[in-house]
Amino acid sequence: MDEDEIELTPEEEKSLFDGIGADAVHMDSDQISVEVQETVFLSNSDVTVHNFVPDDPDSVIIQDVIENVLIEDVHCSHILEETDISDNVIIPEQVLDLDTAEEVSLAQFLIPDILTSSITSTSLTMPEHVLMSEAIHVSNVGHFEQVIHDSLVEREIITDPLTADISDILVADWASEAVLDSSGMPLEQQDDARINCEDYLMMSLDEPSKTDHEGSSEVTMNAESETDSSKLDEASPEVIKVCILKADSEVDDVGETIQAVESETDNGNEAEVTDQRTSIHVPRVNIYMLASDSQKEEEDTKVIVGDEDAGGTAADTPEHEQQMDVSEIKAAFLPIAWTAAYDNNSDEIEVQNATASAMLHHDESGGLDRVPKQKSKKKKRPESKQYQSAIFVAPDGQTLRVYPCMFCGKKFKTKRFLKRHIKNHPEYLANKKYHCTECDYSTNKKISLHNHMESHKLTIKTEKTTECDDCRKNLSHAGTMHTEKGVNKTCKCKFCDYETAEQTLLNHHLLVVHRKKFPHICGECGKGFRHPSALKKHIRVHTGEKPYECQYCEYKSADSSNLKTHIKSKHSKEIPLKCGICLLTFSDTKEAQQHAVLHQESRTHQCSHCNHKSSNSSDLKRHIISVHTKAYPHKCDMCSKGFHRPSELKKHVATHKSKKMHQCRHCDFKSPDPFLLSHHILSAHTKNVPFKCKRCKKEFQQQCELQTHMKTHSSRKVYQCEYCEYSTKDASGFKRHVISIHTKDYPHRCDFCKKGFRRPSEKNQHIMRHHKEVGLA
């Protein structure tokens, strides 16, 4: 049997538990487990109580003074009225003290703490159960330890300082360690998971239990924890140590403001609560609370330090910069038992209790407040790179956040400026993951290194060239050398003055410059055509299709015109007869004559001016107008083109409406085709151009045109370089030109080769490329 366990005889059990009631006690063979809460007795008389026994044992109330803990309510046989209340009252859930000198001693029963109180009868709400007794004696009471099984509570505990709901009974025997519920049934038979729960709260006191009485003005109570922290469950992953305060001196009125500061004693186990008028000596009580999840230790627990005056500063400070000193314990964080003992206003008690509970609240450890943590539905974003920051507080209270550089200590207002600064540090460049094997290039991205290596491959290809002996041109292949040594053919654009020596460059020029006039592009070679029929003929070159065959030989062609040319050149002697209407050829004269009769029979409309016949009147009319009429009475107003009939003029005018007309600046010529306009200017106005603009090199036929053009330049501001003929309209470009070309002052010098640079970033890049090994050494 442990030294903390005692064995009671049947007579002692009967005398001990008769006052509690048979229904509240469950006897298990020879042992019984009882959890005895701290009981505080108040008396306003000067009567000394020794070995007191209650006159009415059925009305005994065992009350706990520790906040947020379930208490034991022993059902009484009857309830007393408020009129029966005498001077001796037991106040539940409050820490009270003697207003006058009291000597309290219990035989074999140790009272851990007795605190002072200034609660008056006017501001006190009386509980439901009140004990009236002139002399209370308790004898033959064994030594018990207070054990708080917080893990057995499956719901959130809500405690009112003055009106607590006394409904549940949790009784435990230190000897048997069996837990009973309100009905007397052991809880371990109900649910093994509840007993094996890791979350519990264990309180340990500092010094051996003793009661000191030093006159009528002070009552000091010191106790020792007989439960060592080493007795905790070995499987517990984490133990959180929480410090609370206890008072051991008598103060009738502490005041409205209580400040707790660290005592300057050598032992370091006591804190001192000071006020302008009083001083209270407060020993510490250590409470160990088990945290069920050790993986939660990486998460930060928000701690708010300070009272109402410091609230603004704590709110302005970021969470990761708020620190808490154990020595700075404010009055707002006093336990509710203390606040109840020194304050008459219960509303202020609740406010201070809420603040105090926030210190003991730990979501991850599963402590007293069992509020289920809601799972966030938001997806976790990838953590960005964190940068250290510092806050400067001005004398007027304003704060300024800056971001210092980890290499040189230079401070910046924003993260963007800090990032740009760090990228130019040699230390940062040396820590890059990927380095080029050909040069000093380094990067943290693999794709960037891949793109950089591709540039090296292109450089290697361009270096493998052959120089032509005639024109000193670098050629990549030997075959190109033979082609280049051939005839220097010049390819000219038929729409403008562009000239090139390669056909591919000319095709590229046509696609880029004259693409609008060539909407039909070949998918194989990129050549453009104006009409889809021309593209269709061109595609046959790539496919090899030759639909046109010669009837005299095996010749095939992709174009009908090529076939006709072939027949005329190769088979002219074999075709003596040819129809003049349908261009059919015949080898026999009779066949040709029979074919001509067919044309004569079909044409019944004879022309009056010639022997022409038509199959219908419309064809005959068209023949007369086009052949025998030289006048064009219907002319276009835009281009002065003439037509024989008004219908033809109407169709022609529609083409002008759908197209934009381009006016020649030298004459009245207009054309919907810009290429025709360019051809007109080159042919009609480029022979003699006496007037030329000195700024834009534009040419004019007349001097008035040049003067009008010069006005457009005068309205724009031109920046002329004083060292050279460079001029520009861009101010930033002009400044960049002067600095880069005409400025010899290079403020940023290399420490190794004394080479100058205009910007620090250029100097750092130079060091990493040419002095990397020296810089790292």
From Swiss-Prot:
**A Pfam family per the record:** Zfx_Zfy_act
Which InterPro entries does this chain map to? Transcrp_activ_Zfx/Zfy-dom, Zinc_finger/UBP_domain, Znf_C2H2_sf, Znf_C2H2_type
**Disordered: annotated span:** 207-234, 361-389
The C2H2-type zinc finger ranges are: 403-425, 434-456, 491-514, 520-542, 548-571, 577-599, 605-628, 634-656, 662-685, 691-713, 719-742, 748-770
Compositional bias segments (type: Basic and acidic residues): 207-216, 361-372
Q: Position of motif Nuclear localization signal?
A: 372-382
The molecular function terms in GO held by this entry are: DNA binding; zinc ion binding
Q: What is its main location?
A: nucleus
Q: Which PROSITE patterns match?
A: ZINC_FINGER_C2H2_1, ZINC_FINGER_C2H2_2
Role noted for this protein: Probable transcriptional activator. Binds to the consensus sequence 5'-AGGCCY-3'.
Q: What is known of its domains?
A: The binding of ZFY to DNA is mediated by the interaction of the GGCC core base pairs with zinc fingers 12 and 13.
Q: Which PANTHER family match?
A: ZINC FINGER PROTEIN, ZINC FINGER PROTEIN 521
Name of this chain's protein: Zinc finger Y-chromosomal protein 2
